[in-house]
Amino acid sequence: MTSTSKLDANQLARQRKKLEKDRRKKVYDDQQVQGTNNSSIVSKRSVEKLYTQVLQPELGEWFQYFVPKGKRRSPAINRGYWIRMESIRQMVIRIIKANSPNVRINVVNLGCGFDPLAFQLLSLFKNQYNLNFIDIDYPDLVKNKYNMIQQSDEIKQLIGDQGSKSSDLYVMETDNYQLVGCDLKNLAYYKEILPKLVSRNVDPHPTSINIFIAEVSLAYMKPQFANPVIEISSQVNNSHFLILEQIMPDGATNAFATKMLYHFQHLRSPIQCVETYPTEKLQLQRFKRYYKHAEIKNLYGNWKFLIDYQMQKNISTIEEFDEWEEFIIFCQHYVIVHATHMDQLIYDDESSEEQKNEKAFSEMSLDSSVAISHDDRFNDEQLQLKFPAIASFKDKIYVNGGLKQTRNDENLEIDLQTGVITKLDQTENLPTARMCHTLTNLGENLVLIGGRSRPGVFFKDVYMFDTAKKWTRLADLPVGRSRHATVKISDHEVLIFGGLDASSSTTGDELFLLCNTNTNSYTPVKPIGDNDNHPIKNLQSACMIFDGKQGYIFGGMEDINVPIVNSKLYRFELVGENNISVTKVFDHSLLKRIGSKAHILENGDKLLIVGGVSPDQLFTKSTNIVTLDLNIFTFKSVEIPNVISEKVPPIFVGFELVQINNKASYIISGGAVCYSFGSCYNSVYKLEY
């Protein structure tokens, strides 16, 4: 028989101290999570202020009552928050419209924060549907929301009379809006109150529909707390669940994912579900444990599926925007899952893009003839630039312009032998600050062409850089170009393709232009041949390469409102003086890349393709760098080793691929703003083949 001795005074004191410490930690952690609401609603108010009156005035402006002092966010953050909010809103609207106007529909916002979705939808639908909204969050936060609502006559008028409350469950109660304080980690309490909440005034509405929303709220809870919330919610009548949550399709070492995880960890509000459910496949499995049906799309899938073309065009008019790569990568790290017991699926296809791509690329073999390594001799900070122009020249590499915090006009010289990066002295005729321009090596000089200042302002000036490291301005282009492609044709000729403003004609004589530095003139080059059947379009950020006899073009954006990205591979040859034969030779989703770079290897038999961003898939360690056999058109993967992914993960946006000789190339510069999480930049990487 064992006996348990009583705790002495010191042990009791230590126990009390530990309990108090645990209590304080829980309060602190909860406050940090609630703090994410404050940052989020400032961004949402920025979107509301800019977008709502132009796009959807019928929704009203309700964030203004919760954000006394607004701040304007960057275009990329604004667009990111807009698609995040609009995706949830559109999904709720489509579920509402799939049901009879007489059916009672409860919209339960779990971890609602100060989100005014209820007020937007009440404003939008007026009395067309029998809608009721239940906002649930931490008791302290809900009290703050209640106080803010009391100060807004517009909200009080919208939600109707606040009579005497039918139950102490409610911090606030009207016929169509209730505010409830509940820490969702208190599962027993949530399970107890939920049936009462959704059955309130339910006698006339026995077949009520219940739509649960968790917009990055369960993400802050460990799965052992978050999943029971989903399970409990699935047990009420006609349940729909909509969750917006982060994923990591390329794992936690992906550059964007690393930045995202660090951001939330740094705020002391780590996201807790993403490492358990990092893929679309695992998120679907998670919800199919509790619901008969589940469907999923990432936010870019929602941008394509839920937002019609006219709306996409209208958005382009609101603020200047040229951050497609950053927007797409952000969208590929967030998903919306819709789960339900009802036969009311919204998306066109239950299988995800991720699943389709998984099947397509699972059989791709490795190309052991190409290897990537990290070259750590350089001061990476000096090369933290997006969309500079870079070229090799006389055993050095030269870098012009690009985007730091702002666009710059600096010239850098990289010595590959010593690893030293030198900033060159400013000279006369210096090209002004710019990005998205090109630098082409003609042997005895470099030619800099075009680029842009702010989005939509394309440059048409052209410069020559000589062995004395001096710039000379040449004749201007007929029209400005940005995100264009260039290749050397001879020691005095540069072929220029695409990069025309959207208002320019998308086909025709001006698409290809030959720059002659001897005559200081430009000659339009007309596409001929197969171009009648498969006309090449004006592409921005396409890849063009040339081996002296023939060349290839792939990728690039056709329509910058969507964008539509080209998946075709074109082969071209110059014919005579003013014609170019352009033939479509292949079409594949792995070629659908914005801002990819490439080299022609093995005497014209192989393409080495590096980076870029695809709207269809997030490129991974296995698909970022691939080779394409140009005889049988099969891809092989160039695997990025873990030692690079874990230490200096690359992000293939706004970078350059510079060939040093027929055996090696360098990946230099490039980076991206990762939504509101901060920026990440490339190191220097060497490719050997």
UniProtKB/Swiss-Prot annotation:
Its EC number is 2.1.1.290, 2.3.1.231. SUPFAM superfamilies: Kelch motif, S-adenosyl-L-methionine-dependent methyltransferases. It comes from the Eukaryota. It catalyses: 7-[(3S)-3-amino-3-carboxypropyl]wyosine(37) in tRNA(Phe) + S-adenosyl-L-methionine = 7-[(3S)-(3-amino-3-methoxycarbonyl)propyl]wyosine(37) in tRNA(Phe) + S-adenosyl-L-homocysteine; 7-[(3S)-(3-amino-3-methoxycarbonyl)propyl]wyosine(37) in tRNA(Phe) + S-adenosyl-L-methionine + CO2 = wybutosine(37) in tRNA(Phe) + S-adenosyl-L-homocysteine + 2 H(+). One of its GO terms (biological process) is wybutosine biosynthetic process. Keywords: Methyltransferase, S-adenosyl-L-methionine, Transferase, tRNA processing. Belongs to the methyltransferase superfamily. LCMT family. This is tRNA wybutosine-synthesizing protein 4.
